[in-house]
Curated annotation (Swiss-Prot):
Keywords: Repressor, Ribonucleoprotein, Ribosomal protein, RNA-binding, rRNA-binding, Translation regulation, tRNA-binding. GO terms for biological process: regulation of translation; translation. GO terms for cellular component: cytosolic large ribosomal subunit. This is Large ribosomal subunit protein uL1. PROSITE patterns: RIBOSOMAL_L1. InterPro entries: Ribosom_uL1_bac-type, Ribosomal_uL1, Ribosomal_uL1-like, Ribosomal_uL1/biogenesis, Ribosomal_uL1_3-a/b-sand, Ribosomal_uL1_CS.
Length: 231
């Protein structure tokens, strides 16, 4: 534990925890500190001026990152017949109906994204207590309940990232890898922030985007000046 504490303290050196850094400077700082033996994920955290306890202040959506996430997602699709065939052809990793429901109910969740055709939702609804807490429940608002399963699968494989505000008014997401070049990371971060901005609920009062910070998996957070972000 002491070793971890020293590493974190060292990584924080040279970072002003109050300053809002231009996006390029922030990216440089986190990449310099991404010293793990694996390709660290670059993550974003946004503090929003909303209270998700109120239905009219819920923030949820999906963003297609222009440069992908750097991660290969396993996609499951609940569909039958021709739609199941379309999903398979589009690259879905797991396709099924009652059999897939039984697999999930049995405790096996071997996927990172879940898509369903509308007619499958009464069946998929039985999995709410399992998929919901994991953020895997299909939802038409983010394009995962759809008849166009091929497009949904390709979007998921190509860099679509869902976001949803948490209890404290925070949204978090992955925007790439530390190995990405600066331009690609900057474009992904700007796209994520822009999508959250466009998802502003009618019930939001005052300053909507209050804070933006980025970090690598094992590194400290760096606050970003939102004015330097352009999608």
């Amino acid at each position: 534990m002491a070793h971890i504490g020293k590493r974190i303290s060292k990584a924080r050196e040279g970072i002003d925890r109050v300053k809002l850094y231009p996006i390029r400077d922030a990216i440089a700082l986190i990449k310099e500190r991404a010293s793990a033996k694996f390709d660290e994920t670059v993550e974003i955290a946004m503090n929003l001026g909303v209270d998700p306890k109120h239905a009219d202040q819920m923030v949820r959506g999906v963003v297609n990152l222009p440069n992908g996430t750097g991660r290969t997602l396993r996609v499951a699709v609940f569909a039958r017949g021709a739609k199941a065939d379309e999903a398979t052809a589009a690259g879905a990793d797991i396709v099924g109906a009652e059999d897939l429901v039984a697999t999930v109910q049995g405790g096996t969740i071997a996927f990172d994204r879940c898509i369903a055709t509308p007619d499958m939702m009464p069946l998929v609804g039985r999995l709410g207590k399992v998929l919901g807490p994991r953020g895997l429940m299909p939802n038409p608002k983010v394009g995962t309940v759809t008849m166009d399963v091929a497009a949904a699968v390709k979007a998921s494989k190509g860099g679509a990232v869902e976001f949803r505000v948490e209890k404290a008014g925070i949204i978090q997401g992955s925007v790439g890898k530390a190995s990405f070049d600066d331009d690609k990371l900057a474009e992904n971060i700007a796209a994520f922030v822009d999508a959250v901005a466009k998802a502003k609920p009618q019930g939001a009062k005052g300053t909507y985007i209050q804070r933006v910070a980025i970090s690598s998996t094992m590194g400290p957070g760096v606050k970003v000046d939102p004015a330097t972000l352009t999608a």
